[in-house]
């Protein structure tokens, strides 16, 4: 099969290697400053391919531009989409509604690999492991015996809380959802309500947020040595400006898999794309 990889970070470079190892042909566009794996080809042309692969996220910090940190210039993602023939298969991650609309007008088969269960579950596991590593590197004490609050009890929050408990950290879970709090307690974790007394929050050595909205009732209650770790995408759930005013250390770490374990993250994209291809009858 012929693949065209467009933009992206280390994850898509490792993905290119995996696709080559499968016996495919791989061309790379908007990766002009990257060292490609042996066998991959740089291209300046947006040629048609059996499968076009966009990065995760597909768009850069400026809406409408391609996420292409290894390219010397900016690229319009809409111009890129418009260059492909109708019916072309295009796979990308975290695709915006506007991007979907543009693909639909062009009659492209746009597929979001980030939305697939095999990706989301694996990505949560990699994120949780990366968060534990980041926490261990930045805490001024061992995880053993530390009091850690995990905000949110979704896929990432659940895996993270149980990894921390396995390392003998005193692990607390804050959730607005009473069922999630009950589930956390049934699994041997401490559950905290957003309406809990401020004194509860004064004991934490670290607070890790996985929720998209701000739910820390009172940052003033946290002790000065408390480490804040933000895993949610912008705007996140931690008021970083307020944290700075209070003298609290805050580390923003969205997209952790791409930084902590790009090979594992590439493997998840690889698996998702192979499954998409099977469903699209390309394999």
Regions found by a protein language model. Name each.
Residues 3-43:
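N-terminal glycine-/charge-rich "phosphate-binding" loop or analogous flexible N-terminal tail
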Residues 3-14, 19, 144-164:
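Glycine-rich adenosine-cofactor-binding loop
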Residues 9, 30-32, 96, 176-177, ...:
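Residues in the short beta-alpha loop(s) of Rossmann-like NAD(P)-binding domains
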Residues 22-37, 167-187:
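NAD(P)-binding Rossmann-fold cofactor-contacting core
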Residues 50-51, 89, 147, 205-206, ...:
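Structural motif
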Residues 54-144, 253, 272:
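Glycine/serine-rich phosphate-binding loop and adjoining beta1-alpha1 elements at the start
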Residues 57-59, 73-84, 184-258:
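Rossmann-like adenosine-cofactor binding region
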Residues 94-111, 232-277:
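Rossmann-fold NAD(P)-binding glycine/threonine-rich loop
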């Amino acid at each position: 099969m012929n693949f065209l990889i467009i933009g992206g970070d280390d994850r898509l470079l490792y993905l290119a290697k995996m696709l080559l190892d499968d016996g495919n042909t791989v061309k790379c566009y908007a990766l002009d400053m990257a060292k490609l794996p042996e066998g991959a080809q740089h291209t300046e042309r947006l040629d048609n391919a059996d499968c076009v692969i966009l990065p995760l996220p597909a768009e850069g910090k400026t809406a409408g531009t391609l996420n292409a940190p290894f390219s010397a210039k900016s690229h319009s993602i809409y111009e890129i989409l418009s260059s492909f023939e109708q019916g072309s298969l295009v796979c990308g991650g975290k695709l915006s509604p506007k991007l979907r609309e543009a693909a639909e007008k062009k009659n492209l088969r746009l597929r979001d690999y980030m939305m697939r269960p095999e990706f989301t579950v694996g990505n949560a596991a990699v994120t949780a492991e990366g968060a534990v590593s980041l926490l261990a590197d930045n805490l001024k004490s061992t995880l053993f015996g530390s009091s850690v609050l995990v905000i949110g009890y979704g896929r990432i929050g659940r895996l993270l809380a149980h990894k921390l408990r396995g390392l003998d950290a005193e692990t607390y879970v804050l959730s607005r959802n009473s069922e999630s709090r009950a589930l956390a307690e049934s699994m041997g974790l401490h559950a905290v309500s957003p309406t809990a007394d401020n004194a509860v929050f004064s004991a934490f050595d670290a607070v890790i947020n996985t929720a998209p909205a701000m739910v820390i009732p009172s940052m003033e209650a946290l002790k000065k040595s408390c480490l804040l770790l933000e895993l949610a995408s912008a705007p996140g759930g931690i008021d970083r400006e307020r944290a700075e005013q209070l003298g609290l250390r805050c580390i923003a770490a969205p997209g952790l898999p791409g930084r902590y374990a790009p090979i594992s993250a590439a493997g998840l994209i690889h698996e998702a794309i192979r499954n998409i291809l099977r469903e699209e009858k390309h394999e």
